[in-house]
């Protein structure tokens, strides 16, 4: 068997060999991960398939994880009075969220005209989205305001503009961002979203999952996201995967599944 020697390859990368003939490149063999010493090939076994749930199309960086942690130890509350003197606690965010959409169902309905997120004494009021509901009907605010916006381009209404990349952030800790419903309403559930990179599965977007096999990318089908994750069946064991959002965005990266979790190249350990 003929061999080729490649020098100075960067470690912790995925590679595939290509042959050039008749003016075109064609893949040879399977893609593989190089850890700096050994290679680990991705071989799709279509005789052994599994089902899973996908939550992201791009790795979650430490920077974004820290942004998401900005909401930790804060709490949501509602009140009939603007000063929140008799506020009712809706929930406390006890840990850094692991996903973008965080749905809270209240033990009992709460009445109030105003709702707000309050950061901890050490944290900044930093929220991408917060939406309040009675049943499945959203209660849309008529007004909003926040304590000490951090920049001239930071507005309280951005917490209900349905744009995950926009957010409110205060310039001081122990602050809050408030929405006004215009009248006393009944809230029995709500959704909050921490500041994030919008690379989580986004409800309403159309996605397509691919696996590498037989020298090309093979589609496992298109799906419209109805929840914060995409359920997929028939995924070949050992395959290299790629999730494409055909609705929006550019950041996407190959990954494989390990112990039921997505592992992107940047997540791989030597």
Task: Report residues per predicted region.
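Short Pro-Gly-centered beta-turn/loop motif in secreted/extracellular proteins
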Residues: 2-14
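Noncatalytic modules at the cell exterior or secretory-pathway interfaces
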Residues: 11-14, 108-119, 233-247
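Disordered, acidic Ser/Thr/Pro-rich linker "stalks" and the adjacent N-terminal cap
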Residues: 12-15, 19-101, 105-110, 123-189, ...
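Short beta-strand segments and strand-loop junctions that repeat across beta-rich extracellular domains
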Residues: 74-83, 205-216, 239-243
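Residue-level detector of high-confidence beta-strand sites
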Residues: 92, 220-222
